[in-house]
């Protein structure tokens, strides 16, 4: 549901995909609370409110809005190392940010998730194409995001019909997390060549899909992982 009575809670909404989503929602929402460690480039005006928060920290999470129609968890990690090079701390950090942070976020949100006008509330999580596609150097993040997908499906069953919950599984999206991978024209061209659509993803690509999953247009979609990967996972050209 997207409209003048809607309230959204976006974790990690001050950078990358989360920031782009906040910009897309800002013109049509009553309130958008953004939980993140810093405001960064966040446009704190109109319905947008920044609440300092570290979802992986020791402190209790802030009190969420009284009624939430849409919640999105954007924090993630890009920790591309060989299995041999990964330490247990690497696995633990990826697990804490991707899964346990999402668990804490969802536990805070659940009592406040309320649909309007007969529509369920909607939750969007982020996975990665590397869960379904075996990729080298992705074992830690793929393990953590695979757990996110399992969590999402379980909660989709548990929370229906009052709440829908889905996940987006992107391939490479041009965000600050991957800036070193796209730091030269040559690197960008090489990355783009891996995809049937011959470009890397943009924050607008991912945010637009998240916005769709928050809207009534996706009202019969729950428990799904939606690929956003330029055709990588299904197309061979």
What are these model-predicted stretches?
Residues 86, 134-142, 154:
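Active-site loop-to-helix junction immediately N-terminal to the catalytic Tyr of the SDR YXXXK motif
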Residues 14, 22:
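N-terminal Rossmann NAD(P)H-binding glycine-rich loop of SDR-like oxidoreductase domains
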Residues 106, 144, 152:
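Active-site helix of classical SDR
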Residues 111, 156-161:
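Alpha-helical segment proximal to the catalytic Tyr-Lys
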Residues 160-164, 221-223:
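Short, small/polar-rich loop/turn modules that mediate ligand/substrate recognition or access, typified
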Residues 82-83, 87-95, 187, 191:
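Substrate-binding pocket helix/loop in short-chain dehydrogenase/reductase
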Residues 211, 222-237:
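Short C-terminal tail/terminal secondary-structure segment
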């Amino acid at each position: 549901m997207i409209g003048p009575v809607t309230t959204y809670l976006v974790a990690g909404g001050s950078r990358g995909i989360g920031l782009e989503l906040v910009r897309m929602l800002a013109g049509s929402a009553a309130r958008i609370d953004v939980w993140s460690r810093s405001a960064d480039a966040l446009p704190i005006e109109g319905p947008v409110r920044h609440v300092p928060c570290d979802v992986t920290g020791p402190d209790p999470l802030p009190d969420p809005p009284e009624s939430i129609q849409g919640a999105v968890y954007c924090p993630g990690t890009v920790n591309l190392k060989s299995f041999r090079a990964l330490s247990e701390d690497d696995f633990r950090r990826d697990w804490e940010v991707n899964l346990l942070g999402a668990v804490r976020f969802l536990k805070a949100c659940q009592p406040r998730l309320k649909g309007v006008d007969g529509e369920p509330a909607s939750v969007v999580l982020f996975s990665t194409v590397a869960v379904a596609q075996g990729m080298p150097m992705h074992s830690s993040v793929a393990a953590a995001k695979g757990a996110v997908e399992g969590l999402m499906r379980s909660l989709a069953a548990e929370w229906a019909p009052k709440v829908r919950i889905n996940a987006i599984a992107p391939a490479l999206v041009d965000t600050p997390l991957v800036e070193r991978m796209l730091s030269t024209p040559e690197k960008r061209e090489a990355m783009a060549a891996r995809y049937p659509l011959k470009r890397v993803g943009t924050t607008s690509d991912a945010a637009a899909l998240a916005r769709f999953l928050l809207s009534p247009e996706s009202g019969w979609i729950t428990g799904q992982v939606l690929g956003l990967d330029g055709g990588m996972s299904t197309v061979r050209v």
